[in-house]
Amino acid sequence: MQVRNARGQLGNGYAHDAKTSSFNKFFDLFAVQWILLCNFAIDIASAELPFGYANRAVSHGGPVWMRIVEQLKLTKMYEHIVLNEPHASMEGLYDAEKSFWNIDADFLNNVVIKWTDWHTDYLFHGLQDSRIRTVRFPYSRFIVDAERLWNDPMESIGQGIVYKEFEDYRRDIPSDLEQHLLNLWHWHQDRLRQALQEGALLLDCHSFPDDLSDVDICIGYNEDWSKPSDDIIDMAVNHFMDRGYKVGVNYPYSNSETPDCDFGYHSLMLEVNKKTYLKPGSILLQDDGLRDDITAFQQRLLMGS
């Protein structure tokens, strides 16, 4: 598998309004009853077949009984979740060997404060569970963008792994120190690989400025081997719609982080609009409403919750 489809591109997906979810509520109740009735089949299937076999069995045909059992198996969700938090920090901006930005009030107010994923390392940590692991990048994205691709297309405008330009600001980095910064990207990718395992879900944790879109919650994924099942994506959309959020699918951002691994796992991005949890014109938290909703979502993602 190759590293591909990193988050960070504006998406061309679609948005759901909470008003359209009444039918989904009825369907969810029916689905829960169906899952309970078929629990025995799920247990039998999970004991013998490896992660990813379900999608292969369905897409390539196979015996009818296998297709039915494998589809049931998908309802078991995940045994492990890895939280990827690459943009939650401001560290390094005043480090003489890492920053190289001409920092002034405008840069902090209009660039750093706007594009830092404030408090995502708090919002996604409401559920204390040994099955959830966190990989938080400890430096600002304006030091190293740990989620860019190697040879990312954004490099052409000075916003690859190591930003050289951002809006009207420029950054001149000595070549030897730039290599040190690139090593931080490798370090973050290695930590993600070590945290992941067969069949896990990587949950890509982000926020975005409220002037970018009126969408409250953006759910993103890749159209490749890392895409969760349609059932899981639908569950994610309905979970937040039923709580009154306007949900975008691969909009306004698309894709999700996929570090190179030699085993199968899924990746799902969750972007939250800053207006849903920050006080207007501030980086102060409103309350724990969104955090509680994310916690409930994580509980649904975990097997047996």
Regions from the PLM with identified roles:
Residues 4-6, 37, 69, 80:
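Absolute N-terminal positional cue centered near the fourth residue
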Residues 4-7, 11, 23-30, 40, ...:
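Hydrophobic, low-acid, alpha-helix-prone terminal segments
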Residues 14-20:
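N-terminal helix-forming leader/targeting segments
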Residues 29, 35, 39-42, 50, ...:
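Short, positively charged and aromatic/hydrophobic N-terminal segments
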